[in-house]
Amino acid sequence: MEFFDVKKMPVNLWRNGAGETREICCYPPSRDFNWRASIASLASNGEFNVVPQVDRVVTLLDGGEVTLLGGGAFRHTLKRHQPFTFAGEHPVRAELTDGRMSLDFNLMTRRDRCRAQVRVADRTFTTGRARGGIVYVLSGAWQLNDKLLTPEQGAWWQEGSHTLRLLKAEGQVLFSEITYL
């Protein structure tokens, strides 16, 4: 299991200048990954990279709403904490709905190898026995193993079942499970 704090992660600027990315994990660590998770800041309208044979799940974490224009395939406005899935083959343009910067959680999976499910939890839970997983704290204080996690912190793992405990009356965590085909 690997723990992370978004505030301490390296920042990579996008080539088109529209935003920046903080990579949470890439498994296995190569261009031919099975799954990859990151946090992205979108500062202006811009194009997403086309990634053939990859499914993408994007979740708005904070900031202004973002409308994704997927050519003739879809038009979708991201709402806070509501995951949206689309195929990486689609050329996608992101437009800031009200001009405010947004912060997004992004999860990409190789379609022929694995699938991802992303959801928000608001109570103590135990993960399934998926082959990979990620948690990202949205609010509250949570305990994973012996580690305290607070907003903008999280963890990822390759295998196993793990219990995430909510330590306060209220809190939310973004949770992803990776299953292999």
Swiss-Prot record:
InterPro entries: RmlC-like_jellyroll, RmlC_Cupin_sf, Uncharacterised_HutD/Ves, Uncharacterised_Ves. Gene3D superfamilies: Jelly Rolls (2.60.120.10). Pfam families: HutD (PF05962). Coiled coil: none annotated. Belongs to the Ves family. NCBIfam families: PRK11396.1. This is Protein Ves. The lineage of its organism: Bacteria, Pseudomonadati, Pseudomonadota, Gammaproteobacteria, Enterobacterales.
